[in-house]
């Protein structure tokens, strides 16, 4: 789909980036000369714009052999970064998709800035193309014409085409993997059960030669996974603990544990959600989708790291045998938990998932979950809440998230917070100390199972979905943290 070339391969549709500056330069200047100064004229007359994210279209004279040119405003070069480039490309490809263009030649060198080298621009191009042209998979009876997608993108450059092609490939892998996660999260809950999620993971394992283990209910009972089993009690769908192992080193050391919450539907259980809050709870497996998306990138790019991915999956339903407030359960770790809120179920399955990852060699842990409404109140829908017990590990993850443009913000876990989750007359822990500090209480609870293992907790409740369409696609799932997790794995520095 993406091709690097030193020559103009497709003249029907061209795309050129324009910085706000007094004079054109580089490839933009060369194209202006080919068009006998028309770009300069159009800029002066205001018919095309170099302001950031402004798109303009121009139809040259037939003798040039070029049918149409899309101009992408990039703003001031001094303000131009990876994120600005990503938005510019996204606006371009979304417009091309809407115009049903199937091929385009992009003058890549016009999108290069002093802080954005050619390889980064190429990565951004392919990643943004796939994110921007993603369409929600629906189940309507279609009678309209079939969708037409962009099939050929030629990145024309004076740089080494082999290096540019490699960067295009990495960006393509990142974009496709994010879209895979989006599709999982958008699926209706009757079409994505825990068994379906396990089947999807098995397909990944087969494709990328991961070691895979899928624990069923009987195996969980033998091991004593009281957290997952308690949440599953109200369901007719069997639970699954999905384990993928990728070994990129000779020895199984410095193992990164990725743990995803896989609640395929959440009614709240007997602590029942109101109707309005229940709609959309198919997305409560967003953490598992982020982990699987990251594993797709890992499988494609094969970093020299060791990774164990653990997904604890069930739905949270109601029946005569369902988990009740006041129940006391025994987790895989042996710690007992007093259930004060059956709608605080995600932390129960994560407790067993985290413990299982530790038991199977994880030396550091990152858990990902659509866990609390509290994090949305605190941070909104653009920033993922983060908690940790290890500043060095957090710093490594923060660097990865910044590189990917995914905003995070650290919330504290104090000794008083830990005391609140340990406050129970009946058990070692309680699963819901109260509404105040809700997001922190959830993180503190999971931290009781991470114990001394370096650990980062990502609460993506606010960022896993969006209600506003953007240049990066429609409403629905965002695939948040897929790129950050994969980048963290690639850059991870273990014990020194």
UniProtKB/Swiss-Prot annotation:
User: What Gene3D superfamilies does the entry give?
Assistant: Leucine Aminopeptidase, subunit E, domain 1, Zn peptidases
* UniProt KW keywords: Aminopeptidase, Cytoplasm, Hydrolase, Manganese, Metal-binding, Protease
Q: Which GO terms describe its biological process?
A: proteolysis
Active site positions: 273, 347
EC number per UniProt: 3.4.11.1, 3.4.11.10
Location in or out of the cell: Cytoplasm
The cofactors required by this protein are:
Mn(2+)
InterPro entries registered for this protein in UniProt: Leucine_aapep/pepB (IPR011356), Macro_dom-like (IPR043472), Peptidase_M17_C (IPR000819), Peptidase_M17_leu_NH2_pept (IPR023042), Peptidase_M17_N (IPR008283)
- Annotated Pfam families: Peptidase_M17, Peptidase_M17_N
| Binding residues annotated for Mn(2+) 1, in chain numbering | 266, 343, 345
> A Gene Ontology molecular-function term?
manganese ion binding
Cofactor: binding comment:
Binds 2 manganese ions per subunit.
Binding site residues for Mn(2+) 2? 261, 266, 284, 345
Provide the reaction this enzyme catalyses: Release of an N-terminal amino acid, Xaa-|-Yaa-, in which Xaa is preferably Leu, but may be other amino acids including Pro although not Arg or Lys, and Yaa may be Pro. Amino acid amides and methyl esters are also readily hydrolyzed, but rates on arylamides are exceedingly low; Release of an N-terminal amino acid, preferentially leucine, but not glutamic or aspartic acids
Gene Ontology, cellular component aspect:
cytoplasm
Known HAMAP family for this protein? Answer: Cytosol_peptidase_M17
Which family does the entry's similarity section mention? Belongs to the peptidase M17 family.
Protein task: Presumably involved in the processing and regular turnover of intracellular proteins. Catalyzes the removal of unsubstituted N-terminal amino acids from various peptides.
Indicate what this protein is called per its UniProt record.
Probable cytosol aminopeptidase
Q: Which organism is it from?
A: Bacillus pumilus (strain SAFR-032)
Gene that codes for this?
pepA
């Amino acid at each position: 789909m993406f091709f690097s070339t030193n020559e103009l391969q497709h003249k029907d549709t061209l795309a050129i980036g324009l910085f706000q500056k007094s004079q054109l330069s580089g490839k933009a200047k060369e194209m202006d000369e080919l068009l006998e100064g028309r770009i300069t004229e159009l800029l002066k007359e205001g018919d095309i714009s170099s302001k950031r994210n402004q798109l303009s279209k121009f139809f040259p004279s037939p003798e040039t052999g070029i049918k149409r040119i899309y101009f992408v405003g990039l703003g001031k070069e001094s303000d131009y970064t990876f994120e600005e480039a990503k938005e510019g490309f996204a606006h371009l490809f979304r417009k091309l998709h809407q115009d049903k263009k199937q091929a385009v030649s992009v003058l890549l060198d016009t999108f290069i800035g002093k802080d954005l080298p050619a390889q980064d621009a190429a990565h951004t191009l392919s990643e943004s193309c796939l994110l921007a042209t993603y369409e929600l998979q629906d189940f309507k009876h279609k009678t309209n014409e079939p969708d037409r997608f962009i099939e050929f993108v030629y990145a024309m450059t004076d740089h080494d085409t082999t290096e540019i092609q490699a960067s295009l490939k990495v960006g393509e892998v990142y974009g496709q993997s994010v879209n895979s996660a989006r599709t999982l999260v958008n699926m209706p809950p009757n079409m994505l059960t825990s068994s379906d999620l396990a089947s999807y993971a098995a397909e990944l394992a087969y494709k990328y030669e991961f070691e895979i283990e899928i624990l069923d209910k009987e195996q969980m009972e033998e091991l004593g996974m009281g957290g997952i089993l308690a949440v599953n009690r109200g369901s007719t769908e069997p639970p699954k603990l999905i384990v993928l192992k990728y070994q990129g080193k000779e020895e199984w050391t410095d193992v990164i544990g990725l743990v995803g919450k896989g609640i395929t539907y959440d009614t709240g259980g007997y602590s029942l959600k109101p109707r309005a809050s229940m709609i959309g709870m198919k997305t409560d497996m967003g953490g598992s989708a982020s982990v699987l998306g990251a594993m797709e990138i890992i499988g494609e790019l094969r970093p020299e790291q060791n990774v164990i991915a653990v997904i604890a999956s069930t739905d949270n339903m109601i029946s005569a045998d369902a988990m009740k407030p006041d129940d006391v359960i025994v987790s895989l770790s042996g710690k007992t938990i007093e259930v004060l809120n059956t709608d605080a179920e995600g932390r129960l399955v994560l407790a067993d998932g985290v413990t299982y990852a530790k038991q199977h060699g994880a030396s550091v842990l990152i858990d990902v979950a659509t866990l609390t409404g509290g994090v949305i109140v605190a941070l909104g829908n653009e920033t993922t809440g983060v908690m940790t017990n290890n500043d060095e590990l957090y710093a490594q993850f923060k660097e990865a998230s910044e590189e990917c443009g995914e905003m995070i913000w650290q919330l504290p876990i104090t000794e008083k917070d830990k005391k609140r989750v340990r406050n129970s007359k009946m058990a070692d822990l309680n699963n819901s100390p109260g509404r105040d500090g809700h997001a922190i209480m959830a993180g503190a609870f999971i931290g009781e199972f991470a114990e001394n293992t370096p650990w980062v907790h990502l609460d993506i409740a606010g960022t896993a979905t969006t209600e506003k369409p953007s240049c990066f696609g429609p409403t629905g799932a965002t695939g948040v943290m897929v790129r950050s997790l994969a980048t963290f794995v690639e850059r991870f520095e273990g014990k020194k």
